[in-house]
Amino acid sequence: MSEKDKKELTQECEELKEKYKELEEYAKRLKAEYENYREEVAREKRELIKNANEYLILKLIPVLDDFERALNQGEKRDAFYEGVKMIYKKLLNVLEKEGLTKIHVGEKFDPFEHEAVERVETEDVEEYTVLEVVESGYKFHGKVLKPAKVKVAVKPRKKEAEKVEKPSDEKE
């Protein structure tokens, strides 16, 4: 083998090594892209399932509301009442395991979680205090699906006579 052939083979070998490195890097990038793609597809699938569950749970909330109304009307010692109460608790438990939470009404009215359906004039409590829950509210994975319908305390309005005093007629 001549010196020229050796140089050509060495050069060709170097070129092949370089090409191998390029292909190896390309394969690594493809593998990383594929892993990222798999993770993204899995994330999208979880989000799709969550959204489908949200839709279903949103449709079931009125059923919970009806159960609550029935329980509030029923005789507490009646066997039928106890049966309905048991079904309500089971349904609520299943939905809570899927991410539904009842909005717990705090001391103050929160427009993001409550819907005021009635204003009650009173001086007995601080203004904008939630006095009563008319209909429960719910969140699904932290997102408000249905605000709680509540009665809110407001300051009593002053009587018109106290607010505006009529000026007396002056005769000249």
From Swiss-Prot:
Its principal location?
A: cytoplasm
Listed SUPFAM superfamilies: Coiled-coil domain of nucleotide exchange factor GrpE, Head domain of nucleotide exchange factor GrpE
Q: Which residues form the signal peptide?
A: none
Q: Cellular component terms, GO, for this chain's entry? A: cytoplasm
Q: Name one GO biological process term.
A: protein folding
InterPro entries of this UniProt entry?
A: GrpE, GrpE_coiled_coil, GrpE_head
In its UniProt entry, what is this protein called? Answer: Protein GrpE
